[in-house]
């Protein structure tokens, strides 16, 4: 209440910001006459002038008014488009590191050129991020003439791009690309073996198009580079056979304590729970087929992977639905993005879910992957010195943008007042009744001559509605994940008179629907068009445009409410662009998922008590309020999940920064000798402590054990007993110093035999190899820790604090293992020739080159015990060769029988891949020690 009173007096924060920016716009406009008077050559020279002024200390803020005026004039001369004042405000917003909410059709692409031009003056690079390769290439080509005129070069990055071309794209003043590609390049850059192989420059300024889609909808999307793990396809196929005989509870809430059912599903959170009866049935089946011993349980430490297979299979059969969450295309399970309706070829759900769905659909079951490097969009984009974004719908998520990314949202006024009319929702008892209501509405709109866009939430809904329209003889086009290749053609004419287009959620499609249709699409297939023919086509289009305007513009029909208000607003925003007329209305039924799961019983009972017929609808404020409350609950739940993820990922992110920083230091450091000597001292000290405890007397010493360990681990024969016999005064401190100095002297001799340059090369090789290997193992351990950490809550412990504590301990152990292995390898390796060293580098690069792009879709919400909601969020994976490296070939025996097992106590399945990266099963490697 107080904030409303204050706002009415001094204006809202958004109003105050707009008022401040209007003053800057006045300064920009004041330059217009002067800039217009310049010749093309003089206008182009302004860029070099700005660069010189900036290098001499003038800030970009100070340059902004004149630079924006120059960019606006250049745009008018090159493209015939002049930035409106509201677009100038948007450009200021982006430059200041904020989010500009600008409605559909208001010119976000043109607006972005202002901030991109200004920030490119610094020479540090500007990244424009889009949601797909098509938009990146389209926008780059669209703006290349403008930036070229101003002396700026433009680059585009894409998957599978030749290395030199990608480097050139990143060196450009302005670079376009997708969020996935920027993120993967960051991870790949931290797996190179030379600084020359890095592609990216330091991350300077970033503008994210459709920022809500990338930083909210995909916030829980880990970017992962992975290698292939053990093939478990037989197990997935086996578990798949038991799922049909498990009994699901019909009334999830009422039967949670009913032991007659085998499992139940919490649809609100998409979680599953198996009853005691269900566990017994599953265990009996696994015992019968020989996968479980008579006295074993699914909760036995070595059998937990089996339990994960079962849970994934139940979710595959009962949570993930064909033609809603995925389609089967050419023998492959392809995920459908619930927010956009697009298929995502190559993406895969993680943690066994995708394999379980493949088993369910009886297609080839592909192998799982092991993580080699990972980050999230949340943490990647926070690496930029300055981050900004633009979208048509951000204000509903303003609180999350501020708390997570420290980004303010500025709502930019429209150039023309919005003429679209948003009608009240119509609510029906049944889905069929709702579809009948939609068809009546379509027929009425068609009779007026207006175009209709029907938005559906799923492929299944679009096909059901299409079938009913066919039955009624209504011509229409369908745009969903199965017709994406016709997308441009369908959208181009979706604004034509009487056209009917059914589309799954249109978020992020990046194409405006023009009233009357897109006349330019008519001439794309014609080789040459005369000026007269061009004028005739334009005149025909103008007639159609005027007809549609007279009929009320584009009419939007939503076939159900989305869980997020933002997606609903994106659908509404397809109509009413740049002051055009339009209308929107949502049709709902009590059978819709949102209504069925979240709407209160009061609403359902009230509608049924009214005695409505199937095709009768009501419009009631209480129902609308109930829907808004339901959407608010879902948005709040998703926000909490993203916030929860960030708490855990921030721990991994801090460790990632340390490892990547050390890796860069290794690549940049010419002389590693001092670091190697310190490493030797630490490793030998730690080993000596095991056999000669600090402050101990000689009766407590295990000298024979120390001699054996030095021989086994480092191939060093030290006559410690002889030293003690020769010098009775040699105490613990003196002996320690002599041992370490002897080891260092021995290493100095080996370096002399190798040669300074060759020794430095070998040191860098072994340190990099050990760091990469143990970081990969550490990521696997962190993933295992995260999956089970929620169980600490049952012991009255804080899972988050426990995760931080244990992950730190794992990190310290990893650093110790890196040092120990590096010293071991350097001590045991035979002195290589120059040819062998060259072969090492070649093999390293070949291993890196084997990586292939693959995506995996997952939710990582299991910190709190939840199951995957992977239809909503995603997980991206790059699959690659995950070999154990080349050190083993040079270092002689890898594991000997006297080595302690570093993975003891970790409850690793004996048939699982050994965490050391040897590619052997655990029972054949460290597990047999």
UniProtKB/Swiss-Prot annotation:
<dbReference type="GO" id="GO:0005524">
    <property type="term" value="F:ATP binding"/>
</dbReference>
<dbReference type="InterPro" id="IPR020937">
    <property type="entry name" value="SecA_CS"/>
</dbReference>
<keyword id="KW-1003">Cell membrane</keyword>
<dbReference type="InterPro" id="IPR001650">
    <property type="entry name" value="Helicase_C-like"/>
</dbReference>
<dbReference type="InterPro" id="IPR011115">
    <property type="entry name" value="SecA_DEAD"/>
</dbReference>
<comment type="subunit">
    <text>Monomer and homodimer. Part of the essential Sec protein translocation apparatus which comprises SecA, SecYEG and auxiliary proteins SecDF-YajC and YidC.</text>
</comment>
<dbReference type="GO" id="GO:0043952">
    <property type="term" value="P:protein transport by the Sec complex"/>
</dbReference>
<dbReference type="Pfam" id="PF07517">
    <property type="entry name" value="SecA_DEAD"/>
</dbReference>
<keyword id="KW-0653">Protein transport</keyword>
<dbReference type="InterPro" id="IPR014001">
    <property type="entry name" value="Helicase_ATP-bd"/>
</dbReference>
<feature type="binding site">
    <location>
        <position position="925"/>
    </location>
    <ligand>
        <name>Zn(2+)</name>
    </ligand>
</feature>
<feature type="binding site">
    <location>
        <position position="914"/>
    </location>
    <ligand>
        <name>Zn(2+)</name>
    </ligand>
</feature>
<comment type="similarity">
    <text>Belongs to the SecA family.</text>
</comment>
<dbReference type="GO" id="GO:0005886">
    <property type="term" value="C:plasma membrane"/>
</dbReference>
<dbReference type="InterPro" id="IPR027417">
    <property type="entry name" value="P-loop_NTPase"/>
</dbReference>
<dbReference type="GO" id="GO:0065002">
    <property type="term" value="P:intracellular protein transmembrane transport"/>
</dbReference>
<dbReference type="InterPro" id="IPR011116">
    <property type="entry name" value="SecA_Wing/Scaffold"/>
</dbReference>
<dbReference type="GO" id="GO:0006605">
    <property type="term" value="P:protein targeting"/>
</dbReference>
<keyword id="KW-0813">Transport</keyword>
<keyword id="KW-0811">Translocation</keyword>
<protein>
    <recommendedName>
        <fullName>Protein translocase subunit SecA</fullName>
        <ecNumber>7.4.2.8</ecNumber>
    </recommendedName>
</protein>
<dbReference type="Pfam" id="PF02810">
    <property type="entry name" value="SEC-C"/>
</dbReference>
<feature type="binding site">
    <location>
        <begin position="105"/>
        <end position="109"/>
    </location>
    <ligand>
        <name>ATP</name>
    </ligand>
</feature>
<dbReference type="Pfam" id="PF01043">
    <property type="entry name" value="SecA_PP_bind"/>
</dbReference>
<keyword id="KW-0997">Cell inner membrane</keyword>
<dbReference type="GO" id="GO:0031522">
    <property type="term" value="C:cell envelope Sec protein transport complex"/>
</dbReference>
<keyword id="KW-0963">Cytoplasm</keyword>
<dbReference type="GO" id="GO:0008564">
    <property type="term" value="F:protein-exporting ATPase activity"/>
</dbReference>
<keyword id="KW-0547">Nucleotide-binding</keyword>
<dbReference type="InterPro" id="IPR036266">
    <property type="entry name" value="SecA_Wing/Scaffold_sf"/>
</dbReference>
<keyword id="KW-1278">Translocase</keyword>
<dbReference type="InterPro" id="IPR000185">
    <property type="entry name" value="SecA"/>
</dbReference>
<dbReference type="Pfam" id="PF21090">
    <property type="entry name" value="P-loop_SecA"/>
</dbReference>
<dbReference type="InterPro" id="IPR036670">
    <property type="entry name" value="SecA_X-link_sf"/>
</dbReference>
<dbReference type="Pfam" id="PF07516">
    <property type="entry name" value="SecA_SW"/>
</dbReference>
<feature type="binding site">
    <location>
        <position position="916"/>
    </location>
    <ligand>
        <name>Zn(2+)</name>
    </ligand>
</feature>
<dbReference type="GO" id="GO:0017038">
    <property type="term" value="P:protein import"/>
</dbReference>
<feature type="binding site">
    <location>
        <position position="87"/>
    </location>
    <ligand>
        <name>ATP</name>
    </ligand>
</feature>
<dbReference type="InterPro" id="IPR014018">
    <property type="entry name" value="SecA_motor_DEAD"/>
</dbReference>
<keyword id="KW-0067">ATP-binding</keyword>
<feature type="binding site">
    <location>
        <position position="512"/>
    </location>
    <ligand>
        <name>ATP</name>
    </ligand>
</feature>
<dbReference type="InterPro" id="IPR044722">
    <property type="entry name" value="SecA_SF2_C"/>
</dbReference>
């Amino acid at each position: 209440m107080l904030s409303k009173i204050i706002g009415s007096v001094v204006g809202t924060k958004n109003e105050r910001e707009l008022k401040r920016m209007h003053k800057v716009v006045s300064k920009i406009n004041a330059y217009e006459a002067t800039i217009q008077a310049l010749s093309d050559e003089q206008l182009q020279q302004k860029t070099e002038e700005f660069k010189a002024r900036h290098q001499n200390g003038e800030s970009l803020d100070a340059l902004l008014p004149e630079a924006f005026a120059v960019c606006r004039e250049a745009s008018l001369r090159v493209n015939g488009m002049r930035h409106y004042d509201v677009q100038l405000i948007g450009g200021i917003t982006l430059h200041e590191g904020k989010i500009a909410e600008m409605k559909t059709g208001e010119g976000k692409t043109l607006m972005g050129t202002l901030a991109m031009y200004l920030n490119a003056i610094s020479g540090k690079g500007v990244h424009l991020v889009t949601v797909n390769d098509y938009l990146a290439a389209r926008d780059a080509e669209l703006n290349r003439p403008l930036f070229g005129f101003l002396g700026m070069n433009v680059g585009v990055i894409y998957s599978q791009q030749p290395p030199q071309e990608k480097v050139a794209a990143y060196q450009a003043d302005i670079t376009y690309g997708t969020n996935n590609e920027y993120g993967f390049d960051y991870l790949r850059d931290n797996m190179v073996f030379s600084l020359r192989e890095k592609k990216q420059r330091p991350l300077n300024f970033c503008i994210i198009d459709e920022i809500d889609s990338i930083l909210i909808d995909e916030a829980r999307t880990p970017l992962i580079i992975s290698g292939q793990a053990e093939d478990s396809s037989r197990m997935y196929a086996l578990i798949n056979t038991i799922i049909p005989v498990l009994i699901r509870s019909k009334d999830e809430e009422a039967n949670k304590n009913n032991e007659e059912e085998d499992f139940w599903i919490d649809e609100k959170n998409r979680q599953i729970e198996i009853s005691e009866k269900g566990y017994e049935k599953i265990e009996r089946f696994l015992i019968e087929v020989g996968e479980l011993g008579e006295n074993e349980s699914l909760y036995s430490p070595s059998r937990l992977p089996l339990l994960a297979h079962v849970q994934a299979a139940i979710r595959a059969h009962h949570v993930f639905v064909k033609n809603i969450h995925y389609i089967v295309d050419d023998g492959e399970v392809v995920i459908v993005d619930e927010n956009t309706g697009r298929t995502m070829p190559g993406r895969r759900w993680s943690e066994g879910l995708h394999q379980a769905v493949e088993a369910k659909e009886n297609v080839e079951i592909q192998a799982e992957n092991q993580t080699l490097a990972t980050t999230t969009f949340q943490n990647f984009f926070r690496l930029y010195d300055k981050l900004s974004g633009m979208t048509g719908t951000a204000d509903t998520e303003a609180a999350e943008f501020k708390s997570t990314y420290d980004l303010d949202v500025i709502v930019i006024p429209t150039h023309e007042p919005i003429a679209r009319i948003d009608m009240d929702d119509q609510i029906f008892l049944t889905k069929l009744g709702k579809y009948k209501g939609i068809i009546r509405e379509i027929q009425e709109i068609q009779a007026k001559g207006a175009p209709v866009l029907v938005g559906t939430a799923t492929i299944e809904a679009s096909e059901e509605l299409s079938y009913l329209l066919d039955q009624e003889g209504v011509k229409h086009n369908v745009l969903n994940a199965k017709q994406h290749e016709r997308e441009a053609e369908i959208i181009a004419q979706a604004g034509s008179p009487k056209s009917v287009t059914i589309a799954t959620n249109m978020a992020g499609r990046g194409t405006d629907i023009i009233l009357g249709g897109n006349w330019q699409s008519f001439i794309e297939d014609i080789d040459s068009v005369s000026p007269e023919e061009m004028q005739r086509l334009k005149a025909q289009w103008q007639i159609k445009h005027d007809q549609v305007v007279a009929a009320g513009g584009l009419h939007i029909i939503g076939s159900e409410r989305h869980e997020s208000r933002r997606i609903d607003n994106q659908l509404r925003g397809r109509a009413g662009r740049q002051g055009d007329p339009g209308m929107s209305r949502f049709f709902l039924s009590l059978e819709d998922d949102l209504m069925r799961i979240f709407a209160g019983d009061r609403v359902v009972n009230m509608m049924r008590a009214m005695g409505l017929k199937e095709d009768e609808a009501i419009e009631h404020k209480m129902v609308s309020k109930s829907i808004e409350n339901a959407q608010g609950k879902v948005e709040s739940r998703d926000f909490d999940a993203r916030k929860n993820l960030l708490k855990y990922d921030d721990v991994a992110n801090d460790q990632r920064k340390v490892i990547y920083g050390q890796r860069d230091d290794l690549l940049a450091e010419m002389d590693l000798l001092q670091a190697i000597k310190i490493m030797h001292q630490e490793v030998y000290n730690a080993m000596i402590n095991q056999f000669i405890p600090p402050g101990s007397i000689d009766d407590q010493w295990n000298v024979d054990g120390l001699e054996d360990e030095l021989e086994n681990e480092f191939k060093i024969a030290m006559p410690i007993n002889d030293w003690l016999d020769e010098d009775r005064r040699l105490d613990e401190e003196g002996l320690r110093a002599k041992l370490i100095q002897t080891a260092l002297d021995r290493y100095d001799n080996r370096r002399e035999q190798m040669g300074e340059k060759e020794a430095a090369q070998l040191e860098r090789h072994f340190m990099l190899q050990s760091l990469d290997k143990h970081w990969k193992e550490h990521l696997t351990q962190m993933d295992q820790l995260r999956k089970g950490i929620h169980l600490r809550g049952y012991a009255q412990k804080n899972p988050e604090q426990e995760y931080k504590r244990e992950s730190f301990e794992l990190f310290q152990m990893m650093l110790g293992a890196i040092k120990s292995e590096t010293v071991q390898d350097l001590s045991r390796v035979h002195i290589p020739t120059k040819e062998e060293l060259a072969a090492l580098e070649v093999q390293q690069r070949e291993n890196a080159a084997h990586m292939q792009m693959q995506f995996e879709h997952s939710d990582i919400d299991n910190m709190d015990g939840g199951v995957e909601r992977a239809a909503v969020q995603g997980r991206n994976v790059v699959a690659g060769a995950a070999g154990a490296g080349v050190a083993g070939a040079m270092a002689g025996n890898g594991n000997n029988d006297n080595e302690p097992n570093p993975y003891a106590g970790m409850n690793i399945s004996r048939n699982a891949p050994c965490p050391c990266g040897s590619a052997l099963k655990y029972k054949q490697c460290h597990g047999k020690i």
